[in-house]
């Protein structure tokens, strides 16, 4: 079992941190590489467990994947993908059960080969994230989908058909899946109430470079099917969640961090909320500098919602900061159910948090104390590390393997700025 030991030295974090490419952008783009018979080259790819799992999935289908990974975490990584020899429609059940993004292969495989078999996807256990919305939309486009226990088989006779699809609820994954499904469909597909996160727009940009015909008008996305897509090169956008996490590390420790490779426009919806709790944001040509303005962290009332609002993936980290804020803070979680598991662990550090349905009330205290903690998912692991940076004494975070699904070399980056973090397997 992976463990992370954090020794609080009560030092403000000061230094520079390079922000890697976005995990939530690169995974759907890797799935979209299935469309092309030519080579795909992706730059600014993060070295993460989920990227390696998606690479293994592509290889299991017959693709050639070459991850050019620099040992220096400060360097950029490149991923080369060639799907010209895909010879298998069965997505590995073992890998798919561990990787939620595997479900994004459904649309590309169905569009290109007319058949795909997989299982319900895995990933973080943070409540219900049903795939019914994906399935209903694909069925509307002409797919026949059979579900047997945890197994899913999708087939189509000929091409998928363009349709007008309106999502009852905004869904990033479903939006991405249907965009990809529609690129080679016959006719025009319109998605209403579509997700427009930067990661979705990066996927669209990638598909357009490949030759797709896609237009975005607010939350309406129109895709006109084309005959084929080509190979291309593409640079993955910066990871706004990683940037937001390190921004909070600066605020929590009353330090000053320069986040390199990211601009304010990349994290504007996050930065706006951080300013309400007392963050100072300075713009530079090669990044942004985050620090705390004056005195203690301020309390706030924050609600998570689809983009362009505050993202759910930043909620656990924000709760860590609010644990030592002045006054009473409230967080409303409106995206995922059961995303307050980290609150129980923060309480072990002394945090004063009460939960009622989708609302967390945090009464800020002056200081936290080290404890033995158990991580539940990716973002809660990051949140516990942030809180441990200012908890008196030592904190051990067990089950911390989740962290490497979304953060490359987090302990090294923080240690280079003054933290004292040790990782053991």
From Swiss-Prot:
Reactions mediated catalytically: phosphoenolpyruvate + UDP-N-acetyl-alpha-D-glucosamine = UDP-N-acetyl-3-O-(1-carboxyvinyl)-alpha-D-glucosamine + phosphate
Superkingdom of source: Bacteria
Residue sites binding phosphoenolpyruvate per the record: 23-24
CDD domains: UdpNAET
Location of the protein in the cell: Cytoplasm
Residue sites binding UDP-N-acetyl-alpha-D-glucosamine per the record: 100, 169-172, 313, 335
Molecular function in Gene Ontology: UDP-N-acetylglucosamine 1-carboxyvinyltransferase activity
Metabolic or biological pathway: Cell wall biogenesis; peptidoglycan biosynthesis
Location of 2-(S-cysteinyl)pyruvic acid O-phosphothioketal modifications: 124
Keyword Zinc-finger appears in the UniProt entry: no
Function according to Swiss-Prot or TrEMBL: Cell wall formation. Adds enolpyruvyl to UDP-N-acetylglucosamine.
Name of the protein in question: UDP-N-acetylglucosamine 1-carboxyvinyltransferase
